UniProtKB/Swiss-Prot annotation:
It comes from Mus musculus. Its main location: cytoplasm. This is Eukaryotic translation initiation factor 5B. Residues 1-604 are annotated as: Disordered. The keyword GTP-binding applies. Residues 820-822 are annotated as: G5. Its EC number is 3.6.5.3.
Length: 1216
């Protein structure tokens, strides 16, 4: 039986594999047969099959159903092992079903026909089997199938591919079933036939629309369907349900896997200890699936045992199976509560671990920071310790130098020369005291230390140099014995001293010093109370010597203090500082000697200057006052210079170019002139006038000269603000008020031009208050009205103002003095008020002080004198031959005063006068200083005097600090004009104008224009010809310089009035610009974008005349146009633009204009409609050259939107 079954199974497998080939043959054979004979033959076959039907077939069918149930379970196991394969097969089978269903719908056959078709197909497949029961039916089936192949050709084609895959699947199932059936007994012998029939039935179930019967033996179809169809449907529903559940479970698993992968990625960044809880989570999540698999295996085993019990048991199994499936679904739905809890606990542990590690990391970083801070503190303390040690060593060396115990190389050479001289003297027979005749040293050495060597008791020479060098020799030789250090230290100490200067040594060479030095030997060597007494004696000797050396009281005071300070330090540290030190420390401080010497000299000079200033500040004499410095400020043409002319009885204003003040001037007004001018003031006490006179400074009022106004106001004690009564406060008046506010300078207001009041009657010989009372009513009313208006304007500026004769509180109210520079009214009252206010309110400020305070006002080049500086001497005195430090363009300038020139009394400093030469000048004066190297002096900064050479570096540093701000103002450009002026003040004003006009300047100079200036300016011809210009303000132009400028092509503009120079240069720039615009007008292309109006096409070709809308930019005549959308075709040049039949030169954005575009010469004319359409945008054809020309010469005609369009077109034309 077993062999027969095996043979049968082998045959069945062979038949299954040959089905595809057999179907193809059947299709080919039966292509030409008709449908009706097929139906009739099919009925005959069915009748034969019914006859052969027997009871054994029913039993086999039941067994097959039970095996099928087992096969489903096996399928489920296989699906658990390989879920992906089943998914693919199921999806493929579903697609096949859909395709089959669609094809079935298309065909015109009904269900009965399709059923017959399937039956015959299945029978044809059975023909190949060597089944003993139905050999005839197999051959008949083959014949029938040949007949039916034509009819079922399409259906077979659609199912062909699906059959192949299903056969593979069924083969695997049959092999499993065979193994089970062999063990089940006799009923298993006929399982092969049942399996073959079940294969057909499964295909029918998958094809819902075409149910087929595929039994091996001839069965009765009707009786067979009644038994199995309901069961098949139920099983099919269960299978579909299970498949859905399995798909859901797979989706859940996929999601869980993704979540786990994300978690793994996040946790892999952390340390290895953190990975263990994650593994636990993974194992916990893996448990439900394994349990489910084991249960399934148990189910299949149970099912095999119960298969043979029959139909009743089968139903019970189905119920059990459905309950188990539900349980499995519940398990597959997700992890249980315990699993979730375990996962949460694992995650909590993981989080705690992270927090713990974070805390540990923070603590570690904190510890490291504390250790670092501790280390830095130790380093700082160590550094301080080293610095203290170094400072002590410096002080010791400094003291030794002061005492003359350290010898430099030059000093040793001098010592050798002195020895040679001594031998010569002895050879000539001069008596020289022997070493025995000299007094012995103190016995202190013998008490404390070893006995002296003979070298320490060498004789002292007679000459001064020998007297000086002997004690130092004793120190150098005696030092090593006392310190008990190796002899190698001695040469190193000598090396330290090599860099010390000879001057310090020679400065101390005097008789008293020799005695002192003899005693000073013991300072460094001994450490006892006697040493301090000796030091005190030596300090007194040093003080007396310094006084003799300095020769003047100021220097001696400073040196006494220095000596006391330094020696007090020395005596205080004498016990602490010990001479013992190793060779390394010597070499360490060896290089510091030069620096410390310079620093020492610098600090000494600084202390001396500070002490001198402090003493001068204390010795202020309030009884003796200096002349107050009065500054005159105001708007243009208010009468500032005219007021001064009236005071001085001069005509400076008439001699000025254009009547404009362009320089700062200073006038000395002596006491006699004050008394003369104030004789009409009755209550003026002329006997008690304490000021020796007045120094009045006149400043320019024009806008350009704000720097000079600022400079003049910065050094004045009191100011006169001149206001035109007819015009009130004007721009420069308000600027002057703000300057005075910022400087906190007191001022009085001169209400000038009262003679302009209607019916004013002048009375210069009387007080202005009396003169006002004498005027007519209408004149007084007008004056009061205008005065009140000006008081209101002052109130708007935050100042209280009142007429001087009504002012009860001059500290809170500004005094207004009505004046007339033309008639002289009010001049006496003005001077009286100035004298009164300065004597009473400014007595402390005007107190006589020896401390020098001076300020450079102007730098001028005078013929026959060279470059001179006008200086306002505020305090102190200046002497001829003094070393002065003045600020310069390239740094402070150190020079000597060669001459002090003063203008005659009541004469203007800036006007060329017969200057008086003085040896000494006292404050306050306007003085002209002659000296060397004053060409690059900067005005507006202080002048300092150095009484000693070592003070020069200190004073230089003071000036450098103040220089920085002024130097930042004058910055030269690489390309620009050359500027030349008579004074620095007017040069600054000219540069300020150029800066506001955005004109660069490449060179500046003060003085006449020479050939060298033309040479410098001619350099610009190579860079930019428009800047090859010299602006000469109020200076003479040499003839040879003018000739050279003409030959080279350099323009020289010269004017005495700054505004005329401005106008001339501005006109030149405009002309030059027009010339260049004319030159570049064909190159410069203005950007534009035009849209064609299709209803206004007047001419389409040669020339093109069309109406357009300017969308952006501006269209000008001569603009070349192109069409970017048509491969940048050039259509021509705009030659004419019309608006409302009127021709215009330019059309701007938003305008609708008619343009005539003529073709480019030498090119074929372009045509509207062929080369471009109405939809195309026309743009101007720009290039890099045209853009540069616009930037350089047509910038004023371009707007911001035009530049934006250029940027847009650059991208279109790809211009870099």
């Amino acid at each position: 039986m077993g062999k027969k079954q095996k043979n049968k199974s082998e045959d069945s497998t062979k038949d299954d594999t040959d089905l595809g080939a057999l179907a193809a043959e059947i299709e080919g054979a039966g292509a030409a047969k008709e449908q009706e004979p097929q139906k009739s033959k099919g009925k005959k076959k069915k009748e034969k099959k019914k006859q052969d039907f027997d009871e054994n077939d029913i039993l086999r069918e039941l067994e097959e159903l039970s095996l099928e149930a087992q096969g489903i379970r096996a399928d489920r196991d296989a699906a658990a092992v390989k879920p992906t394969e089943n998914n693919e097969e199921e999806s493929a089978s579903k697609q096949d079903k859909k395709k089959k269903g669609q094809k079935g719908k298309k065909t015109s056959f009904d269900e009965n026909d399709s059923e017959e078709l399937e039956d015959k197909d299945s029978k044809s497949k059975k023909t190949a089997r060597p089944n003993s029961e139905a050999p005839l039916s197999g051959s008949e089936d083959a014949d029938d199938s040949n007949k039916l192949s034509k009819k079922g050709k399409k259906a077979q084609k659609s199912t062909k591919k699906r059959d192949g895959s299903e056969e593979d699947e069924d083969n695997s199932k049959r092999s499993k079933e065979r193994s089970r059936v062999n063990s089940s007994g006799e009923s298993g012998g006929e399982s092969d036939e049942f399996l073959q029939s079940r294969k057909g039935q499964k295909k029918n179930q998958k094809n819902k629309s075409v149910p087929t019967v595929d039994s091996g033996n001839e069965d009765d179809d009707s009786s067979f369907k009644i038994k199995t169809v309901a069961q098949k449907k139920a099983e099919k529903k269960e299978r579909e349900k299970k498949k859905r559940d399995e798909e859901k479970a797979k989706l859940r698993k996929m999601k869980e896997k993704e979540e786990l992968e994300k978690g793994k990625k996040e946790q892999s960044k952390q340390r290895e200890p953190q990975k263990r809880p994650e593994e636990e989570v993974l194992t916990l999540r893996g448990t439900p699936d394994t349990g489910a698999a084991s249960e399934e295996k148990g189910d299949t085993a149970a099912a095999l045992e119960d298969d043979n019990e029959g139909d009743k048991k089968k139903k019970d199994k189905k119920k059990k199976k459905t309950e188990k499936d539900e349980k499995e679904k519940e398990k597959k739905k997700g992890p249980s509560k315990s699993t979730v809890k375990a996962i949460q606990e694992a995650l909590a542990k993981l989080k705690e671990e992270e927090e713990r590690q974070k805390r540990e990391e923070e603590e570690r970083i904190k510890r490291l920071e504390e250790l670092e801070a501790k280390r830095k503190e130790e380093e700082r303390l160590e550094q301080e310790k080293r610095e203290r040690k170094k400072q002590k060593e410096k002080e010791r060396k400094e003291r030794l130098k002061k005492e003359g115990k350290l010898l430099t190389k030059s000093q040793r050479e001098a010592r050798a020369r002195a020895e040679v001289t001594l031998r010569h003297l002895q050879a000539q027979g001069v008596e020289v005291p022997s070493k025995d005749s000299l007094p012995k040293k103190r016995p202190v050495y013998e008490d404390k230390k070893k006995k002296k060597t003979p070298q320490q008791l060498e004789s002292k020479e007679v000459s001064e140099t020998l007297e000086i060098s002997a004690p130092v020799e004793a120190v150098d030789q005696g030092g090593p014995e006392k310190e008990e250090t190796p002899p190698s230290v001695e040469p190193e100490e000598e090396e330290d001293t090599e860099d010390a200067g000879l001057d310090d040594w020679e400065a101390m060479a005097s008789d008293e010093e020799r005695e002192k030095e003899g005693n000073m030997i013991h300072i460094e060597v001994e450490e006892n109370p006697e040493e301090e007494e000796e030091e005190e004696e030596e300090e007194e000797e040093e003080e007396s010597e310094d006084e003799e050396e300095e020769g003047d009281s100021e220097g001696s005071d400073g040196d006494e203090e220095d000596c006391k300070l330094s020696d007090e330090k020395d005596s205080g540290k004498a016990g602490d500082t010990k001479p013992s030190k190793d060779a390394s420390s010597d070499s360490e401080y060896d290089s510091d000697d030069d620096r410390t010497k310079e620093e020492r000299a610098y600090d000494k000079a600084k202390r001396r200057i500070e002490k001198r200033r402090l003493e001068h500040g204390k010795n202020v004499n309030t009884e003796k006052l200096r002349a107050p410095i009065i500054c005159v400020l105001g708007h243009v043409d208010t009468g500032k210079t005219k007021i001064l002319d009236k005071l001085r009885h001069t005509h400076v204003q008439d001699g000025e170019a254009g009547g404009i003040t362009q320089q700062i001037g200073a006038t000395n007004v002596p006491l006699e002139a004050i008394n003369e001018q104030t004789k009409m003031i009755k209550n003026f006490d002329r006997e008690n006038v304490r000021i020796p006179g007045m120094l009045i400074i006149d400043t320019p009022g024009h806008e350009s000269f704000s720097n000079l106004r600022n400079r003049g106001s910065s050094l004045c004690d009191i100011a006169i603000l001149v206001v035109d009564i007819m015009h009130g406060l004007e721009p420069q008046t308000i600027e002057s008020i703000n300057i005075l506010k910022s400087k906190k300078c007191p001022f009085i207001v001169a209400l000038n031009k009262i003679d302009r009041l209607y019916d004013w009657k002048k009375s210069p010989d009387s007080d202005v208050a009396v003169t006002l009372k004498k005027q007519k009513k209408n004149t007084k009313d007008e004056f009061e009205e205008r005065a009140k208006a000006i008081i209101v304007e002052f109130a708007q500026q935050g100042l209280n103002a009142a007429l001087f004769y009504e002012n009860k509180d001059p500290r809170t109210f500004v005094s207004l003095v009505p004046t007339s520079a033309h008639t002289g009214d009010g001049m006496g009252s003005l001077i009286y008020l100035l004298v009164e206010l300065t004597q009473t309110m400014l007595s402390k400020r005007l107190a006589h002080c020896e401390e020098l305070r001076a300020q450079v006002m102007e730098v001028k080049a005078l013929p026959g004198m060279g470059t001179t500086i006008d200086v306002i001497l505020i305090n102190g005195r200046l002497k001829e031959g003094d070393t002065i430090i003045v600020p310069g363009v390239e740094g402070p300038i150190v020079t000597q005063i060669r001459g002090l020139l003063l203008p005659p009394p009541m004469k203007e400093l800036r006007v060329k006068n017969q200057y008086e030469k003085h040896k000494e000048v006292e404050a306050a004066q306007g003085v002209k200083i002659l000296g060397k190297d004053l060409e690059k002096t900067l005005a507006g900064l202080p002048l300092l005097v150095a009484y000693k050479d070592d003070e020069i570096p200190v004073l230089k540093d003071e000036l450098i600090h103040e220089l920085k701000q002024t130097l930042n103002a004058i910055k030269l450009e690489e390309k620009g004009v050359y500027v030349q002026a008579s004074t620095l003040g007017s040069l600054e004003a000219l540069l300020e104008f150029l800066k506001t006009s955005e004109v660069p300047y490449a060179g500046i100079n003060i003085g006449p224009v020479h050939k060298k200036d033309v040479m410098k300016a001619s350099v610009m011809l190579e860079h930019d010809p428009q800047y090859a210009v010299i602006l000469a303000f109020d200076v003479r132009i040499e003839r040879d310089a003018q000739e050279m400028a003409d030959s080279l092509g350099v323009r020289i503009f010269s004017a005495e009035i700054i505004y005329h120079l401005f106008d001339a240069f501005t006109k030149y720039r405009q002309d030059y610009k027009k010339q260049k615009q004319e030159e570049f007008k064909h190159i410069a292309v203005f950007p534009c974008k035009m849209k064609i109006l299709p209803q206004y096409i007047f001419n389409s070709r040669d020339p093109i005349v069309i109406g357009v809308t300017v969308e952006a930019g501006q269209v000008k005549q001569g603009t070349p146009m192109c069409v970017p959308s048509k491969n940048f075709v050039d259509i021509g040049i705009v030659t004419s633009i019309e608006i409302n039949h009127k021709q215009v030169d330019v059309a701007k954005k938003g305008q609708e204009v008619c343009v005539k575009i003529e073709p480019i010469p030498g090119e074929s004319p372009k045509m509207f409609g062929r080369h471009f359409e109405a939809t195309d945008i026309l743009v101007s054809k720009i290039s890099r050259q045209s853009i540069d020309a616009l930037k350089d010469w047509f910038r004023d005609e371009m707007q911001k939107s035009d530049w934006q369009l250029i940027v847009e077109l650059k991208k279109v034309f790809e211009i870099i």
